[in-house]
Regions:
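Active-site-proximal beta-strand elements of phosphoester/diester hydrolases
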Residues: 1-10, 99-114, 145
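Active-site beta-strand/loop signature of hydrolases that rely on acidic residues for catalysis
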Residues: 3-7, 22-40, 102, 131-154, ...
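Surface-exposed cleft-lining segments at the edges of enzyme active sites
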Residues: 82-83, 108-125, 162-166
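Structured beta-strand-rich core segments of catalytic domains in phosphoester-bond hydrolases
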Residues: 35-38, 42-112
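Conserved beta strand-loop-helix elements of the APE1-like EEP
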Residues: 61-76, 196, 208-223
Length: 223
């Protein structure tokens, strides 16, 4: 099974390119983040027209996650994480697809720090770890895919000093991510490229793409 994760940063604005990418690459499952639309605004027909079923967890103007599956509609298992009933951010969606448990994750950024946004990020990561443990206990094939907003190691960023003060690579958030690896989850990209130097994000400002000034914050954790 080919599983992809893609922070689309606004599904309506990038729908033509997203459809083009689906047709070109034909992933069996695609986890989307930052769809930035309410549930009723999700363009389901556009995906059905190219052979994909979908479920989604939307939010007006912010956040939002979705799971697309080729030739089937994912069977929803969970929407949101337990632990903070007052948390209304649409950041987590979980489904079964052809015998595999799939989660689409948009973890909080955490900037600026210190402060409530970073504290929220750490609490959210602990809630995710608890849910991951529940999935692990089911002893089923599973992948937790998405934008984790965490640079796990220095080899995952073009210049560690340039990002040293960012919430993406603070010791606390890195430790929370590594704790999940310690629980048994496998970082798929790191397993394939242990030397690092593989980026999933480049800032659109200051010519980051042209300079290859990127970092790795999008991860697929496998059971």
């Amino acid at each position: 099974m080919r599983i992809a994760t893609f922070n689309i940063n606004g599904i309506k604005a990038r729908l033509p390119r997203l459809i083009e990418w689906l047709v070109e690459t034909q992933p069996d499952v695609a986890c989307l983040q930052e769809i930035k639309t309410q549930d009723e605004g999700f363009p389901i027909k556009a995906f059905e027209d190219v052979g994909y079923g979908a479920i989604w967890h939307g939010q007006k103007g912010f956040n939002g996650v979705a799971i697309l599956a080729k030739d089937v509609t994912p069977t929803e298992v969970a929407r949101g994480l337990e632990g903070e009933p007052e948390d209304e951010h649409s950041r987590y969606l979980e489904a079964d697809v052809k015998g595999v448990r799939v989660a689409s994750i948009y973890l909080p950024n955490g900037n600026p720090l210190p402060g409530p946004k970073f504290n929220y990020k750490l609490r959210w990561m602990e809630r995710l770890r608890k849910r991951a443990a529940q999935i692990w206990a089911e002893e089923i094939p599973a992948v937790l895919a998405g934008d984790y907003n965490v640079i796990p190691f220095d080899r995952d960023v073009w210049s560690p000093p340039a990002m040293a003060s960012d919430a993406l690579m603070q010791p606390e958030s890195r430790a929370a991510y590594r704790a999940m690896l310690g629980d048994g989850w496998t970082d798929a990209l790191a397993a394939r490229h242990p030397q690092g130097g593989v980026w999933t994000y480049w800032d659109y400002q200051a010519g980051a793409w042209q300079r290859d000034a990127g970092f790795r914050i999008d991860h697929l954790l496998l059971s």
